[in-house]
């Protein structure tokens, strides 16, 4: 009887797990199949990671905290009108800049994609039932240490030097400013990130993918409401 119940429990848990994965298959994107539908929920590095000596999968609890803190530090700097850089600068103050909070579902989807080792490539569909989801990717390496998550996020922040608030996002400038504009998109509320740290060709690489809900970077829309 105990064995039968144990088997039943395993079957039920398996069905629940499969149904969760199948839910993502119901989420449709015009650009393609959802990441979790295509690859499942495993965050184990895929065969595409061959040749990379994986040291860690996913951000630590401390790194999660730092990711949220760095996003909000920079968002509030911009919101208060203290960001002097730009093309031209300074950036105007904002009246609708939310403080971001961590979202585990966004992080899970980001980690599934990061673990495919499709380096610096965006996945085709990462939405949730709640959100259209935006994405930023960063990659940096050093010969003697893994670059910090803060350093990676600052790569996105530094794109502000090329941004003109009055022009906004265009097809022409998106490649230069799109990470910055997603970082400070006023209506975005939540962030969740996946990461890999690995050694390749004697370099210590830190690869970071952050998903944002709701997404930003809509052409023709201001990145935030100017105060």
Swiss-Prot record:
Subcellular localization, as worded in the UniProt entry: Secreted
Tissue expression per record: Expressed by the venom gland.
Domain SCP per the UniProt entry, residue ranges: 69-212
Keyword Disulfide bond: yes
Bilayer-crossing regions: none
GO terms under cellular component: extracellular region
Top-level lineage group: Eukaryota
Disulfide bonds: 25-37, 29-125, 49-117, 193-210
Record-linked InterPro entries: Allrgn_V5/Tpx1_CS, CAP_dom, CAP_sf, CRISP-related, V5_allergen-like
Signal peptide: 1-21
Keywords: Allergen, Disulfide bond, Secreted, Signal
Family: Belongs to the CRISP family. Venom allergen 5-like subfamily.
Protein name: Venom allergen 5
Taxonomic source organism: Polistes dominula (European paper wasp)
